[in-house]
Each structure stands twice: as C-alpha cells, then as structure tokens.
C-alpha cells in the first residue's frame, strides 16, 4: 500500500462507532494506516457495517492488533484517577491501550503523555519534532567546531592610568545596564498585566459563550428512518455519532507535516468516557466526520453538590442515588462540562443563579426510641412482623441492596413482556392486538422524601 501524502496522521485507531457510521472512502485521506482491536471488530453486528468491514479486509488497510497487558494496566490506572473506569468496558480500555501503545512506539517513549491527570507537560520537548532534532544536532556540531578552534589571547598594554579609565568605564556601563533592566522590568510587568487582563476577558467571554450553548441546547431530533436507525441506536447507548459533542477544531492542523510528534497517532471514537480519558492523557483525538483534531469536548457529567467531585454518567442508564466519594444522598446533579486537550482540565459550567433547595433540612430524622415511634409501634418497640418504614440513607444498607435487586428484577420482567407483545422486532414490526398485561411497577425511594417536614393532612 502506497503512503498517503495528504494524510493528517500516520496511524488512526478506529472505535466501533466510526466503523459503523462511515466507510473506507471517508477515511482514506485521514491517515496512512488504520488500526482497531479484534474485540471491537467482532463486536460489530450490523449488516451494512459488516459489508464495509469486508471492503476494509479486501484492501488490507485495517490492521487488527491486541494491546499488551502493560498498556492495558497503564490506561486502567489512569482511568481510575479520572473517575471514568467504572463506565469503561473492556473494549474501551483495549482501544485506549492500543492508542497508548502506538503513541509510545512511534514517538520513542511516553514523553508526550501525562502520568496522572493535571500533570504539566514539557513544552520544549513537545515543540521539538524530527526537524527540530536535526537542527539541534547541526547546532551542536557547529558549537563543537567553534570550540575546537583555539582562541587568540588579547594582550593589552598600559599602566595605572589606563586601568583607572577602564574601571570608570566599566562602572558607567554597569550603572546604565541596571537602569535598562529596571525599565525593561517595569515594561514587562505592564505587558504581563495587560495580557492577563486580556486573557481573563477572553476566558470570561469563552465561558459565557459555553454557558449560552449549554442553556440553549435543544434535545429535539429528527425522525427515525431505516437509514438512520443504526445512528439512533448508537445515540441511545450514550455515544456520539457526530465525532464529539460541541467539537472545537482547528483548520490549520490539516497542513502540518507528518513528521511532527503530535501527528503520529490519533484516536477516533464517539464515546465520551473514552474521549475524556484520551484528552487528559494528551492522546490525539480526531473528529471522524471532518478529520480535524478535537481541541475540547463538551458533555454532561454528575457533580456532587456536597463534595464537588465530578463523576461520569452511567452508560447503562441506571440512576446514581449516592455520591461515590462522600456518600451523600440526593446531592448528585447533572452538570455541563468541557475537557481541554491542551491542559487536560475538566471545567464544569454552572448556572449563575443556581440555588440549592434546603427543603427537608429543618429537622433531623426521628429516633427509633422517640415518643412518636413508641406510639406507632407500642412499648415493645420495633416489631419485624409489622409493616415498617425503613429510611434509606446510605448505600451500604441492606434495605437499599434489596430494593435495587427488586428494581432490576422488575425491569427484566417488563422487558420480557414487552418483547413478547411487540413480536420480538420482526420484519413488519408486528404488534399484538391484545392489551399488555402483567407489567409491574417498582420505585426506589431514597431518604424521607421531598416533603419530609410537611405535616400530613389527617383524613
């Protein structure tokens, strides 16, 4: 296979979403070689996508590589630090590990990557590519040649008068140099202040623009047709079919030389958790719709109002009732966030007029030994044979584990009944004319409820 000179990167790693939504002709000018893992390749079951994979296989352009155990362990450790490990599947970890492995192989080490979230990168190393290395070697050779030539000694002649004049001249030059340094320092401070003010204004404007985007976001979509059915299923599973939500990419990255270290390996995926880990590791992300480098991604995460920790949204769609860090109940709120590829920082975008609802915090939970409890249960106290009202306040309570297990059983039971009623999704989408019977309802109640301090109306 001849190398593509118009490619953006040398190696492009493709996840399941790019392979399902686009064909080889869409990616052929994006990279010189394409990679994926065997598990992702076997995961694709869609008929049209399998036809596209047959084209990839016939051309021999898609390489199936399984990452090493060391790479998987490194990526898993980093994902645990970012908080995304709980929502990453084995295929997601393998894709990230393969990208990490190729990055180390093509750039001779992991000097471009972060060891842990928030680490500062060495800009001097990042800016030096292969051309820069050649220039450095040439400069070193010139310095060695200049050092090999012996320098002539300057012999000066003169007595005490010449020495006094020379010392006076050196004193004047030193004084002038000090004055120049002070003036330059004042100018530098003024310039730094003005630049800082400009940066603050730009950041304020940028954050306000982002907040406007999040507040004005609309969830309405198009009609689901047989043509976009696969994309609709992928969207429902929590992945992004447009490359990234709110991508901000740069057009100038198209024309950068392929020998630069930052243009060796890129990852194309629609999964936000994978994108989040990749950006915080400083791995390159490519928008598989436009072929441009993703600078920042925007999505939603869960933020605890008590401890301010941020967690990814569960992929299975199940609600999280307790904070994994502080154990707070009802404190997890959905929050818009953006991830920057340059710094790896996750920035939450909060509402400026947000007010926390303090309803239910006036009184503490009643004690089992209180007079009201004695009136309700009698002097015997807690009796297991009578109906109880056990308040769920912590995740490790046996009552919580019991209701979660019951809710999971109810969900599977209802799905089974619905599949039988619809007809299993046949070709003509046959629906039974009989009414649905046998559906069960089950709700998990956490805490005392919204109106815990309100007095109940007696009938």
UniProtKB/Swiss-Prot annotation:
Bias type Basic and acidic residues, positions: 120-150, 165-194
Q: What is the effect of changing residue 92 to N?
A: No 20S cleavage
Region annotation Disordered: where it falls in the sequence: 120-205, 366-385
* CDD domains found in the cross-reference section: PIN_Nob1-like
| Any one GO BP annotation for this protein | maturation of SSU-rRNA
Limits of the PINc domain? 10-115
The subcellular localization recorded is: Cytoplasm; Nucleus, Nucleolus; Endoplasmic reticulum
Give the first-level EC class, as a single word.
hydrolase
Spell out the Basic residues composition-biased ranges: 151-164, 373-385
Pfam families reported in the protein's UniProt record: PIN_6, Zn_ribbon_NOB1
Residues annotated as binding Zn(2+) are: 304, 307, 323, 326
Q: Reply yes or no: does the keyword Translocase apply.
A: no
Q: GO molecular function terms here?
A: metal ion binding; RNA endonuclease activity; small ribosomal subunit rRNA binding
Alphabetized UniProt keyword annotations: Cytoplasm, Endoplasmic reticulum, Hydrolase, Metal-binding, Nuclease, Nucleus, Ribosome biogenesis, Zinc
Q: What is the effect of changing residue 110 to N?
A: No change in activity or growth
As recorded in UniProt, its EC number(s) are 3.1.-.-
Q: Name one GO cellular component term.
A: nucleus
Xref: Gene3D superfamilies: 5'-nuclease, Nin one binding (NOB1), Zn-ribbon-like
Identify its protein family. Belongs to the NOB1 family.
Q: Its quaternary structure?
A: Component of the small ribosomal subunit, ribosomal RNA processing complex (SSU RRP complex). Interacts with PNO1.
Additional information = Present with 4490 molecules/cell in log phase SD medium.
Role summary? Required for the synthesis of 40S ribosome subunits. Has a role in processing 20S pre-rRNA into the mature 18S rRNA, where it is required for cleavage at the 3' end of the mature 18S rRNA (D-site). Accompanies the 20S pre-rRNA from the nucleus to the cytoplasm. In association with NIN1, may promote the recruitment of the proteasome to the ribosomal subunits stalled in maturation.
Which protein are we looking at?
A: 20S-pre-rRNA D-site endonuclease NOB1
Q: Which organism is it from?
A: Saccharomyces cerevisiae (strain ATCC 204508 / S288c)
**Gene transcribed to yield this protein:** NOB1
């Amino acid at each position: 296979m001849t190398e593509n000179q118009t490619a953006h990167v040398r190696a492009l790693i493709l996840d399941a979403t790019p392979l399902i939504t686009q064909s080889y002709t869409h990616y052929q000018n994006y990279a010189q070689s394409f990679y994926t893992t065997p598990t992702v390749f076997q995961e694709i079951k869609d008929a049209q996508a399998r036809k596209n994979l047959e084209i990839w296989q016939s051309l021999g352009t898609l390489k199936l590589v399984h990452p090493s155990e060391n790479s998987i362990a490194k990526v898993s450790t980093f994902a645990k630090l970012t908080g995304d490990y709980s929502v990453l599947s084995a295929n997601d970890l393998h894709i990230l590990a393969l990208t990490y492995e190729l990055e180390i192989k093509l750039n001779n080490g992991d000097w471009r990557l972060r060891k842990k979230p928030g680490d500062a990168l060495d800009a001097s190393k990042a800016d030096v590519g292969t051309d820069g290395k050649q220039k450095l070697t040439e400069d070193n050779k010139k310095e060695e040649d200049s050092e090999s030539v012996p320098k002539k000694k300057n012999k000066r002649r003169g007595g005490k008068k010449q020495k006094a004049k020379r010392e006076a001249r050196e004193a004047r030059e030193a004084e002038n140099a000090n004055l120049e340094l002070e003036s330059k320092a004042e100018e530098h401070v003024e310039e730094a202040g003005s630049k800082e003010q400009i940066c603050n204004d730009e950041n304020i404007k940028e954050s306000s623009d982002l907040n406007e985007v999040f507040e004005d976001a609309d969830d309405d979509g198009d009609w689901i047709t047989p043509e976009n059915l696969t994309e609709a299923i992928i969207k429902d599973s929590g992945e992004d079919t447009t490359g990234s939500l709110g991508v901000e990419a740069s057009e100038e990255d198209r024309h950068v030389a392929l020998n630069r270290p930052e243009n060796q390996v890129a990852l194309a995926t629609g999964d936000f958790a994978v994108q989040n880990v990749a950006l915080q590791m400083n791995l390159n992300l490519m928008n598989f719709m436009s072929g441009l480098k993703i600078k920042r991604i925007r999505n939603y995460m869960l933020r605890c109002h008590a401890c301010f920790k941020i967690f990814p949204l569960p992929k299975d769609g199940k609600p999280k009732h307790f904070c994994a860090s502080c154990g707070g109940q009802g404190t997890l709120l959905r929050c818009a966030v953006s991830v920057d590829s340059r710094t790896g920082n996750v920035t939450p975008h909060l509402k400026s007029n947000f007010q926390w609802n303090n309803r239910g915090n006036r009184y503490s939970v009643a004690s089992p030994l209180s007079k009201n409890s004695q009136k309700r249960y009698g002097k015997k106290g807690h009796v297991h044979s009578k109906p109880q009202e056990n308040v769920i306040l912590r995740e490790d309570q046996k009552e919580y584990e019991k209701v979660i297990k019951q809710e999971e059983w109810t969900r599977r039971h209802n799905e089974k009944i619905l599949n039988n009623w619809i007809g299993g999704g046949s070709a003509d989408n046959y629906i039974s004319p009989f009414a649905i019977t046998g559906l069960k309802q089950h709700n998990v109640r956490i805490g005392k409820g919204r109106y815990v301090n309100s007095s109940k109306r007696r009938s």
